[in-house]
Amino acid sequence: MTTAKRPLALLILDGWGYRENTHNNAIFHANTPVLDRLNAQYPHSLISGSGLDVGLPDGQMGNSEVGHINLGSGRVVYQELTRISKAIADHEFEQNPALCDAVDSAIKAGGAVHIMGLLSAGGVHSHEEHIEAMCRMAVARGATKVYLHAFLDGRDTPPRSAKSSLSHFDDLFTTLGHGRIASIIGRYFAMDRDNRWDRVSQAYDLITQGKSKFQYDNAVTALEAAYERNENDEFVSSSAITDADGQVATLQDGDALIFMNFRADRARQITRSFINPDFDGFERAVVPKMHFVTLTEYAGDIKAPIAYPSENLVNTLGEVLQKQGRTQLRISETEKYAHVTFFFNGGKEEPFEGEDRILINSPKVATYDLQPEMSSAELTDKLVAAIESTKYDVIICNYPNGDMVGHTGNFDAAVKACEAVDACIGRVVDALAKVGGECIITADHGNAEQMTDETTGQAHTAHTSELVPFVFVGRNATIDEGGKLSDVAPTILTLIGEAIPAEMTGKPLIHIKE
């Protein structure tokens, strides 16, 4: 008979930061009696989830991928943004073998170099400085046909901020003497991660056939027309940009296609549509035979050259629990499932021995402000059942609402999202109390605590660099101040009586009073 476990649950409230300013702060204005009570009764502090503390550049806002890698690995992990920016500064980028091979193969075949990615200074999925470096490198190596397929942001940046980026790249190509922007489309279509293939197909058809809803002779003109249609950057319809002769640039046999996003989760679907022989997400009218390169590693099943392969993380929390014969559960909705599994495990797809996973489907709505509670009730039903089963030593759960609804910029919906999560936490804490379990409540980064950009007055749809909550609901304890996300895994190991491996550089934040 299996011994009953007293589970330790880590509840990650995605996009839930702490902000002193209460103006347009959805978390402050939400009615959250459960969290208010827990903060009053139990030890708590604030920890850092941004900038240098998570391996990002100083001042750079945190994000879900980075947050979960730090949470699960127990160390500050040098992030792809920093790593690639450093390679550019050190002039190593222009010698990268995978990128050089792609450019050279296209030149040799008389083809074009196509560069696609999120044209954004947001630094969450990509950075436009990296895209600029790629354009410069391609021309420097002798490419005369360089085409940029720009995915527009408006989510990790202000909703209407793409104009300066597009203007900059128009000027860049003029300076370089070669290349141009070939198409623009909102990330809503090109970077879907929830198997909404009808969206992805529009980006695929745009790049491979020039098939678009609109056609313009200039990218800025195309963007301004989208604004006239009331489309913010994220939702810009497929727009092909013609050259002086009225021609569109499409991906052909012998061309190279370089995907400049460094974050994996929203890069996987469109990548598979380009390279998987047995792809069945939608009907592909053409499948060009081209040289495809990914900037980083997107998934184990994606077989393409990688410019910057993942660094192997040893002795993450999941791996240590496996080695000690512990059981663990990972649970979230579709939107954050990859984060509590792949990213939390340091970029490993396969579950560890003793690791169960539960995926709850996120609601099929256009944007989550239409259903701010998302699937939190069903998620909590499954989580409570898992706690009551007493099967697990450690449970990792992510509630996506604060982030996913925060990204819509809809203040009232974000308030409702926070209230829904608070009610769920109450159920989880009650279930843990019945079985003698404990929980840590924290977040991966901020978002919902700032719903308006104080400078522009526009909706603030991006993450923030605010500190995030850290609450321990359990035994009588003290909590150290000044912690960061990488301290969470060592804290969990200490609470369950396991040794912290040398690879974990984080420090335990919770100290039980004997």
Swiss-Prot record:
It catalyses: (2R)-2-phosphoglycerate = (2R)-3-phosphoglycerate. SUPFAM superfamilies: 2,3-Bisphosphoglycerate-independent phosphoglycerate mutase, substrate-binding domain, Alkaline phosphatase-like. One of its GO terms (cellular component) is cytosol. InterPro entries: Alkaline_phosphatase_core_sf, BPG-indep_PGM_N, Metalloenzyme, PGAM_B_sf, Pgm_bpd_ind. Its cofactor is Mn(2+). Mn(2+) 2 binds at D14, S64, D444, H445. Substrate binds at H125, R155, D156, R187, R193, R263, A264, D265, R266, K336. Pathway: Carbohydrate degradation; glycolysis; pyruvate from D-glyceraldehyde 3-phosphate: step 3/5. Binds 2 manganese ions per subunit. Keywords: Glycolysis, Isomerase, Manganese, Metal-binding. Mn(2+) 1 binds at D403, H407, H463. Its EC number is 5.4.2.12. Signal peptide: none annotated. The active site is at S64 (phosphoserine intermediate). GO terms for molecular function: manganese ion binding; phosphoglycerate mutase activity. GO terms for biological process: glucose catabolic process; glycolytic process. Catalyzes the interconversion of 2-phosphoglycerate and 3-phosphoglycerate. Monomer. Belongs to the BPG-independent phosphoglycerate mutase family. NCBIfam families: pgm_bpd_ind (TIGR01307), PRK05434.1-5 (NF003897). This is 2,3-bisphosphoglycerate-independent phosphoglycerate mutase.
